[in-house]
């Protein structure tokens, strides 16, 4: 791929995707005046397809969308597909983290297991009947308080036992090798024709 539209306006996702997709030229949809698609799907995969199709149809170019979020099994999968708006539509990362920590306040260490899930959809064109779909999972534990300034979203409370730090304390070089998004993009690369 020489050029691709990124079907997101999330600055954190744009930065990570640009790093992970280099040397492909990544054009954020906002640069073309394309607004976010309405996320009406009931799964990460459905939302990734909706977003990629929306951007591809308006740009008339291939588009890649990522729909990802945090899944906490002890909270019945919350925040899940609502991760970005867990504390409300106008919520920011800090609000969402506080909502999560509040809901988990009385949970034991065993109940704090969590994972990030990423679904990526690549549409060659708006009517692509066979979009490429790839997924990745990144396991961790929800800490009791935020720590670290790297990354975005729930990274400050996503603790990685093997690294003894949160995802927000990891250098970008390491996170971009082990994250859910990195795993999904590696899977996508394997699906691309030579």
UniProtKB/Swiss-Prot annotation:
Q: Which UniProt keywords apply?
A: Hydrolase, Magnesium, Metal-binding, Nucleotide metabolism, Nucleotide-binding
What Gene Ontology molecular-function terms does this entry list? dITP diphosphatase activity; ITP diphosphatase activity; metal ion binding; nucleotide binding; ribonucleoside triphosphate phosphatase activity; XTP diphosphatase activity
Instruction: Give the species this sequence originates from.
Output: Legionella pneumophila (strain Lens)
What is this protein's record name? dITP/XTP pyrophosphatase
Chain sites annotated for binding substrate: 8-13, 68, 152-155, 175, 180-181
List residues binding Mg(2+).
38, 67
- Cofactor(s) the record lists: Mg(2+)
The answer on whether this UniProt entry bears the keyword Hydrolase reads yes
């Amino acid at each position: 791929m020489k050029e691709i539209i990124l079907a997101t306006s999330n600055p954190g996702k744009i930065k990570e995707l640009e790093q992970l997709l280099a040397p492909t030229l990544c054009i954020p949809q906002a640069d073309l005046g394309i607004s976010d698609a309405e996320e009406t799907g009931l799964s990460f995969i459905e939302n990734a397809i909706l977003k990629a199709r929306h951007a591809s149809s308006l740009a008339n170019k291939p588009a890649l969308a990522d729909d990802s979020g945090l899944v906490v099994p002890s909270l019945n999968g919350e925040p899940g597909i609502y991760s970005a708006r867990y504390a409300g539509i106008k919520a920011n990362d800090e609000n969402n983290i506080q909502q999560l920590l509040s809901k988990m306040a009385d949970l034991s260490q065993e109940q704090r297991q969590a994972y990030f899930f990423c679904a990526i959809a690549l549409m060659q064109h708006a009517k692509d009947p066979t979009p490429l779909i790839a997924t990745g999972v990144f396991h961790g534990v929800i800490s009791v308080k935020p720590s670290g300034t790297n990354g975005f979203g729930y990274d400050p409370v996503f603790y990685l036992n093997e690294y003894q730090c949160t995802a927000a304390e990891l250098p970008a070089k390491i996170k971009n090798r082990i994250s859910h998004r990195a795993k999904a993009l590696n899977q996508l690369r394997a699906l691309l024709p030579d």
